[in-house]
Amino acid sequence: MNRLIVSTCLGLAFLGLHLDSHAGRYALMPDQVIDGVQETAQVDVAVLVEDARIASLVAKSDIPAGYERIDLQGMTLMPGMINAHEHPLLYDDNYQTAHLTASSAYKALLGLAVMQRWLAHGWTTIRVMGDGDVFYGNQDLQRVFSEGVFVGPRITGAAHYISITGGGGDINYGSPEQTLIADGLIADGPIEIRKAIRTEIKYGSDWIKLLVTGAFHSVGDDPRNVAFSPDELAEAVAEAARHNVPVAAHAHATEGI
């Protein structure tokens, strides 16, 4: 069963790339279709595609003339999957040092390969929840995908985490004499939080990510502690709302959640 699912996702993903680059009319004929609406998979159904977009589902016996028939025997068609929490540019397990050892361009190129691999496995939408990048590599990838320069999944999300000084998005392992650039945006107080959110939106983030508590993999903070004050959180949500941008929160422990 696992082999069937993997083969199906791979086959359909690459089929999708083919159809996307060859506008026309196709009738996809799998063994069954999961449409996300019916409670059970549908059999004897074809998916009609026009100009790289799904037009309708019809019985295989009712496929209109003029459609190129593509036999997908042994496969199941289903909607693309959504990964709602991902960090595509974290190429190293130690996310607190990875951004110091590679450029934003290098990580974007690695992210391109990663996202194309995810697309081939059936993930058609990726929500980025901050990443190990001091610039905006994911937003650049989103741009080249939307412009058709490269084929990749849809990207939404936040370029960075917004963290307090000493929080989960800060670098807390250096001595006071060292100046290290954090991969998060460090903001303290309503004014700095407002500016950080405006900066994120300016450069393409369509979500805001707040590190409301400490994290497990960062040095010098505690996942049980709430980082932002109520006033800071209220300002963050209000500022994002002014731009019609949703807010996501990293939160551990009862009080943080």
Predicted regions and their residues:
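Bacterial N-terminal signal peptides that target proteins for export
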Residues: M1-T8
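Histidine-rich, glycine-flanked metal-binding segment
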Residues: G24-Y26, V33, V37-M78
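Metal-associated gating/positioning segment near the N- to mid-region
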Residues: M75-R143, E147, D231, E255
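Glycine-rich, aromatic-flanked loop segments that form ligand/cofactor-binding clefts
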Residues: M81, R143-G169
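Active-site mouth loops of central-metabolism enzymes
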Residues: T97-L109, S175-K195, P246-A251
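Divalent metal-dependent hydrolysis catalytic cores, especially in the metallo-beta-lactamase
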Residues: L112-G137, G152-Y161, S205-S218, P246
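Histidine/acidic residue-rich metal-binding segments in metalloenzymes
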Residues: D140, I191-I257
